[in-house]
Design a protein with these regions (language model features):
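Glycine-rich phosphate/ribose-binding loops and adjacent secondary-structure elements
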Residues: 94-96
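Flexible, membrane-associating and regulatory peripheral segments of lipid-active enzymes
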Residues: 1-62, 74, 79, 84, ...
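Helical cap/lid subdomain of alpha/beta-hydrolase-fold lipid enzymes
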Residues: 140-273
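Generic surface-pattern signal
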Residues: 43-46, 112, 116, 173-174, ...
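Serine-dependent carboxylesterase/thioesterase catalytic core
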Residues: 59-72, 76, 82-91, 100-192, ...
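A generic structural signal for short coil/turn motifs at secondary-structure boundaries
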Residues: 98-100, 232-233
């Protein structure tokens, strides 16, 4: 499969979808990452509301954790999606220390096994932060096995240094982040329905680096903004609801997320504003 795509050009230098080469989030936003504890704690009071999200059709879902995290970090999200009638699994590769040798190969094998086990039903891929890079790239490699891709705070369209985690990446992976970024066309969307969930108050990843630019090759892409921290976005009730809503769409009948009506306009700001 060739990794080419007709990416729409930005309308002007102020276009929100311009490739982000700016600085990472400010020290103030980074200090506010402690909000993740509140986001985790808010799952319990919001649980009855979360249970009103659409119920799925039982297709398989794989969730990829962020940098240095393991499947333990995605337990709240995976547990919730299990109640929405999905066959959910973690990535089963321990801690995510970057694109080590064999990581993508193991991911490919896992997706194929899930695809076959489900009777050749396509698999939805969800990735938190760096895990979203894996989800996107694996979907590019194997679109015939993948139903949709959803990323949470994933920096795929910005310069490597536009995150506050690039030094941690180099330390844990032993690799140069610029070299790794050049190996892939990260801003290019996979050829499947693709959703990027991001937050302008992300203290680790510059939010502009999580914006999916419009694509002529794949019109089924979107950005959903939530109010969340980076470390808590995978446990944030608004993000969890959006994930469940996206997964519940009938295969082959993708529609963009409806953020208008009721409280949605407050919980999900306009990402293009």
């Amino acid at each position: 499969m060739t990794r080419t795509d007709a990416i729409a050009q930005p309308k002007s230098p102020t276009d929100p979808f311009t490739h982000h080469d700016g600085p990472p989030p400010s020290p103030w936003l980074m200090a506010m990452e402690f909000r993740a504890f509140w986001e985790f704690g808010s799952i319990v009071p919001f649980w009855p509301l979360l249970q009103r999200a659409p119920v799925g059709d039982g297709h398989p879902v794989i969730v990829f954790p962020g940098l240095s995290a393991s499947d333990g970090s995605t337990v709240p999200l995976r547990s919730y999606l299990s109640t929405r009638n999905y066959e959910v699994s973690g990535w089963n590769q321990g801690h995510n220390f970057g694109p080590r040798a064999g990581v993508l190969e193991a991911g490919s094998h896992q997706i194929h096994e899930a695809f076959l086990k489900a009777g050749k039903r396509t698999v939805s891929l969800i990735g938190w932060s760096l895990g979203g890079i894996y989800a996107r790239e694996l979907a590019k490699l194997h679109p015939e096995w993948v139903r949709c891709v959803i990323t949470l705070g994933t920096p795929f369209s910005g310069a490597p240094e536009s995150t506050n985690a690039w030094r941690l990446f180099r330390l844990t992976s032993g690799r140069d982040i610029k070299s790794e970024s050049r190996r892939f066309q990260l801003p290019v969307a996979p050829p499947v329905p693709t959703t990027s969930i991001f937050s302008r108050t992300d203290g680790i990843v510059a939010w502009q680096g999580s914006l999916q630019r419009p694509s002529k090759a794949n019109p089924n892409t979107e950005n959903i903004e939530v109010i969340a921290s980076h470390l808590g976005i995978g446990m944030n009730p608004s993000a969890m609801w959006a994930v469940a809503d996206r997964l519940a769409q009938p295969e082959g009948a993708w529609q963009a997320f409806g953020r208008k009506g009721g409280l949605r306009g407050l919980l999900y700001p306009d990402p293009a504003r």
